């Protein structure tokens, strides 16, 4: 435990210094917008809205269903991010989720050389996006159904992919069950891009997001849609849980 607490201290010092130059909330200095980890039980830590369970290898935080129909580019964003094209929204700051994942030992992609990829998703950015790497993670959502019974599902089961072919009619298929990639975002021009853009998790390749989609079709911004047959009602509260897969 002493070694782990030392890691926490070092990570917090690093994160506080790294994020000190990112834009602060209006009328607040940057130092006040970053929460220090607090141990609430043996091996369990909270960073603001984010909870880290070291033994379970999980990071959890509150979110809510944001869309029940339509085209998606993101799985999860903040309310200040591109919420008009995201399945979930969460008030948890991406920088605090990132610190929580660092506490679990997650590793993302290398810092990209081209800062131009920090922009929003479009055909040009997709064409020049690097091949993304990172640790594999599983993402689940916990919510209560109409009867008040707790349910747990893999988040990809609330997503479908539309496959368009010149040779036959378009086909809609469920998103494949499987891991996501913790790519970890990056810094550019003294900004942590996931925090600046409010981008937790992208369905369409976006290096600025903390999490990316490794499935076929992730390089196309017209293929991913809400699975309106299975997604809970809009604004349904969920607990978003990220589990780091064994390496």
What positions do the PLM features span?
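Bacterial N-terminal signal peptides
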Residues: 6-17
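Long, low-hydrophobicity ectodomains and other hydrophilic envelope-associated domains
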Residues: 27-247
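Boundary at the C-terminal end of the N-terminal hydrophobic targeting segment
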Residues: 18-20, 24
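N-terminal secretory signal peptides that target proteins for export/translocation
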Residues: 1-5
């Amino acid at each position: 435990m002493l070694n782990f607490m030392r890691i926490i201290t070092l990570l917090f010092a690093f994160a506080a210094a790294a994020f000190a130059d990112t834009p602060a909330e209006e009328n607040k200095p940057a130092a006040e917008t970053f929460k220090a980890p607090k141990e609430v039980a043996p091996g369990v830590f909270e960073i603001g809205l984010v909870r880290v369970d070291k033994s379970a290898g999980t990071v959890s935080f509150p979110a809510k269903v944001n869309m029940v129909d339509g085209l998606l580019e993101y799985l999860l964003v903040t309310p200040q991010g591109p919420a008009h094209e995201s399945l979930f929204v969460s008030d948890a700051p991406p920088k605090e989720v990132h610190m929580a994942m660092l506490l679990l030992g997650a590793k993302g992609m290398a810092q990209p050389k081209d800062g131009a990829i920090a922009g929003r998703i479009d055909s040009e950015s997709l064409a020049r996006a690097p091949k993304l790497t990172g640790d594999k993670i599983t993402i689940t959502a916990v919510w209560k159904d109409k009867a008040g019974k707790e349910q747990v599902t893999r988040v990809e089961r609330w997503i479908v992919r539309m496959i368009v072919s010149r040779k036959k009619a378009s086909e809609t298929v469920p998103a494949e069950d499987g891991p996501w990639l913790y790519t970890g975002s990056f810094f550019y021009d003294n900004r942590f891009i996931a925090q600046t853009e409010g981008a937790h998790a992208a369905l369409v390749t976006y290096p600025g997001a903390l999490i990316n989609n490794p499935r076929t079709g992730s390089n196309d911004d017209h293929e991913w849609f809400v699975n309106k047959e299975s997604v809970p009602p809009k604004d349904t509260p969920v607990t978003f849980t990220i589990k780091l897969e064994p390496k």
